[in-house]
């Protein structure tokens, strides 16, 4: 890859990647798992990019979406990459480091021959260098072929005794952005009367709290209004319950990191989805934000009209816990 070859590469004043990591290693050692983990951590990831396009990719402006600008970049490269030779790879890395100020590092994933054979046998896949010969021959050839890359790697991880979840945890500890302490959290409020969402990871039923729906002056309001907050907080069960829920979530969410979970939906429900579930969702969201969790909050049923079945029960004068 010569300097002249790159003369047509696009230039841009857009924010370059904050960091560039070249992810390589032995086939079956965990490159795909590593790239998925980097993507979950907010990195931009590209797999099996031809070496001749490395410089062009780095100079290409990122997506116009603000969240993509200046993100770290993880590039998956191995012996199957088009145009890959060790000499070309080493020369390309040297040139990138000369022409770019941001950190450019190499992560090499290693694994024992016996474990690689077990993994390929388990998945019933062929080793890419052993299509017409014994698997151990292909593994040995690739190991020798990539030895010079392994020698200069900035980070070396041996995955022989490492599970997929353990590898994800190790990568997060090593490479997660400084402000990344948790998976993305989505908090949802809804009403049981309109059905339970299918994507909830954790669901808390808040129908045990006193119901502002039965106060005629409060009925038109929602859990976003201070009058509703005051009413719900008067319930002696409120503070002990939400405090225990908060403590449980602060305990669980970091452990989702360790298992590689990058997205979790926490749902709070009442009957109509307008009062109790809304306020509790907001209360919990505020405490999680204080703990520096990245989250979004959605109130599914907040602006929906009262269901006909609810109206009938109210007109019949039954002790129905709506809202």
From Swiss-Prot:
InterPro entries: P-loop_NTPase, RapZ-like, RapZ-like_N, RapZ_C. ATP binds at residues 25-32. It comes from the Bacteria. It holds the Pfam family PapZ_C. Keywords: ATP-binding, GTP-binding, Nucleotide-binding. GTP binds at residues 78-81. One of its GO terms (molecular function) is ATP binding. PANTHER family: RNASE ADAPTER PROTEIN RAPZ. Belongs to the RapZ-like family. NCBIfam families: PRK05416.1 (NF003828). Displays ATPase and GTPase activities. This is Nucleotide-binding protein ZMO1325.
């Amino acid at each position: 890859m010569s300097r002249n070859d790159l003369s047509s590469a696009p230039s841009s004043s857009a924010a370059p990647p904050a960091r560039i990591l070249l992810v390589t290693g032995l086939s079956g050692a965990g490159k795909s798992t590593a790239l998925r983990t980097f993507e979950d951590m907010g990195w931009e990831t590209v797999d099996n990019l031809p070496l001749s396009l490395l410089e062009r990719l780095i100079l290409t402006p990122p997506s116009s979406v603000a969240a993509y600008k200046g993100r770290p970049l993880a590039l998956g490269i191995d012996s199957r990459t088009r145009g890959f030779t060790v000499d070309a790879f080493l020369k390309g890395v040297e040139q990138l480091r000369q022409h770019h100020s941001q950190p450019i590092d190499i992560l090499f994933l290693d694994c024992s021959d016996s474990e690689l054979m077990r993994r390929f046998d388990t998945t019933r896949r062929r080793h890419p260098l052993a299509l017409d010969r014994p698997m151990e021959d292909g593994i040995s050839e690739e190991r020798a072929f990539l030895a010079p890359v392994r020698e200069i790697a900035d980070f070396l991880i041996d995955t022989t005794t490492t599970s997929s979840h353990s590898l994800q945890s190790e990568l997060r500890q090593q490479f997660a952005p400084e402000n990344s302490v948790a998976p993305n959290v989505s908090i949802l409020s809804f009403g049981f009367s309109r059905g339970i969402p299918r994507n909830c990871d954790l669901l808390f039923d808040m129908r045990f709290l006193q119901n502002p729906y039965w106060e005629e002056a409060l009925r038109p309001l929602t859990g976003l209004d201070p009058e509703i907050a005051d009413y719900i907080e008067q319930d002696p069960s409120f503070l002990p319950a939400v405090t225990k829920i908060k403590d449980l979530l602060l305990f669980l969410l970091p452990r989702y990191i360790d298992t590689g979970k990058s997205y979790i939906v926490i749902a709070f429900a009442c009957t109509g989805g307008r009062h109790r579930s809304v306020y509790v969702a907001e209360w919990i969201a505020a405490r999680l934000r204080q703990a520096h969790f990245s989250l979004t909050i959605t109130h599914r049923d907040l602006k929906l009209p009262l269901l006909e079945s609810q109206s009938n029960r109210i007109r019949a004068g039954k002790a129905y816990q709506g809202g």
